[in-house]
């Protein structure tokens, strides 16, 4: 994984954790948790691709990896919609910048996961 992507994830997670969104802080914590989960999943797919012979290991370890991949794409789509919604309703420039960067990162990660998954198929 690209070191810029790692720092982008860490930066966005740190910024999101500092936001005070009042009653929606539970929702934000859920988004942060999903971001972290997505990062770990993307990293594990990337490592599997780097080892290329690891496809059989990946399949035997998790016979439902295609189903899991589909679920991750659903999570990404949900996060994209949630981030877009937050972007529309927030008035704080700090939050707008953070959510714009989060949206860009989600789109990049979605593309990376697609690329990794095509290499594994």
UniProtKB/Swiss-Prot annotation:
<comment type="similarity">
    <text>Belongs to the influenza viruses NEP family.</text>
</comment>
<keyword id="KW-0946">Virion</keyword>
<dbReference type="GO" id="GO:0042025">
    <property type="term" value="C:host cell nucleus"/>
</dbReference>
<protein>
    <recommendedName>
        <fullName>Nuclear export protein</fullName>
    </recommendedName>
</protein>
<dbReference type="Pfam" id="PF00601">
    <property type="entry name" value="Flu_NS2"/>
</dbReference>
<comment type="subunit">
    <text>Interacts with protein M1. May interact with host nucleoporin RAB/HRB and exportin XPO1/CRM1.</text>
</comment>
<keyword id="KW-0813">Transport</keyword>
<keyword id="KW-1048">Host nucleus</keyword>
<dbReference type="InterPro" id="IPR000968">
    <property type="entry name" value="Flu_NS2"/>
</dbReference>
<dbReference type="GO" id="GO:0044423">
    <property type="term" value="C:virion component"/>
</dbReference>
<feature type="short sequence motif" description="Nuclear export signal">
    <location>
        <begin position="85"/>
        <end position="94"/>
    </location>
</feature>
<feature type="short sequence motif" description="Nuclear export signal">
    <location>
        <begin position="12"/>
        <end position="21"/>
    </location>
</feature>
<dbReference type="GO" id="GO:0039675">
    <property type="term" value="P:exit of virus from host cell nucleus through nuclear pore"/>
</dbReference>
<comment type="function">
    <text>Mediates the nuclear export of encapsidated genomic RNAs (ribonucleoproteins, RNPs). Acts as an adapter between viral RNPs complexes and the nuclear export machinery of the cell. Possesses no intrinsic RNA-binding activity, but includes a C-terminal M1-binding domain. This domain is believed to allow recognition of RNPs bound to the protein M1.</text>
</comment>
<keyword id="KW-0945">Host-virus interaction</keyword>
């Amino acid at each position: 994984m690209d070191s810029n992507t790692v720092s982008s994830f860490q930066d966005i997670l740190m910024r999101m954790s500092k936001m005070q969104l009042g009653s929606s802080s539970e929702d934000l914590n859920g988004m942060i948790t999903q971001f972290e989960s997505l990062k770990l999943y993307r990293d594990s797919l990337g490592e599997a691709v780097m080892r290329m012979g690891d496809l059989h290991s990946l399949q035997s370890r998790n016979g439902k990896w295609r189903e899991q991949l589909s679920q991750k794409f659903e999570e990404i789509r949900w996060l994209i919609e949630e981030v877009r919604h937050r972007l529309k309703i927030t008035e704080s420039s700090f939050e707008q910048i953070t959510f714009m960067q989060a949206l860009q990162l989600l789109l990049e990660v979605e593309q990376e996961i697609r690329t990794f998954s095509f290499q594994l198929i």
